[in-house]
Amino acid sequence: MITEDGAQLLKASEAGGSEGPVWDGKDSLYFTGRGRIFRLDAGGTTHVFREASGGANGLLFDRERRLVVCEAANRRVTRTEADGTITVMAESFEGKKFNSPNDLTMDSKGRIYFSDPRYGKRDSMEMNVEGVYRIDAPGVVTRVLGRDLVDRPNGLLVSPGDRYLYVADNNNNNTGAARKLWRFALRADGTVDGQSRKLIYDWGDGRGPDGMEMDAKGRLMVAGGLNKAQPPHETDKSKGGVYVLSPKGKLLEFIPVPLDEVTNVAFGGADLRTLYVSAGGTIWSIRVKTPGLAH
């Protein structure tokens, strides 16, 4: 068992946390939902960090502990500076607006990778690619994965040593579309070796993978699945929860979460042994034996 003996899944916050949990490296968990960014402090109180968040989804703290935000509604990625000002990191590619930046990860050099899918209405899309991009500096953006290798990218994770980029490919709006977790080799320059694509896990015709994290033993914690089918596109064959996978894709364990939709995970607490899960407008927590990787 990866969880502590007797550990139970607990409700940490019911403020409306639907996505983006991230530990700030000190004493708080940040997360998104209801158009806001929230902060859950060490005492268990939830605060509104930002009221108008631009439809914030995925969150990340960079090496200088600045909050980087996927603003899905504003179709951009921003960074909050120490003085509270906002720096736009990415808002277009080749003159076209992004679809709706969703989730992000960072490599050891501080380069940020983000996914740009479009769920729901598609009439405002300016590009026909739902890709993965790398930000080297504000406004310096490169597409690293396109439609030839991913269908609808969502959660991302760079492995230790920048060896791999894991991509949750989750097109849950179409029957028979991708609900897969891929692994790609990362080159030193931050580009992706497309020929290295390896299938790690397939959710079949259920709800596919979303956000993910890795623990200190290299095991993947992947949010995914669905407790109640959503016909015609999604069955409930893969239940909602956290899928604990080996680096090669073996299902080692499953942590069920009772509410849909299970969207993301984060390690937190002073020892990084509290696993937080966003699902059903709630932030859940459970204690685990092995800490998560520090960011």
Regions found by a protein language model. Give the residues of each.
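Sequence-structural signature of mature extracellular/luminal beta-sheet repeat domains
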Residues: 1-295
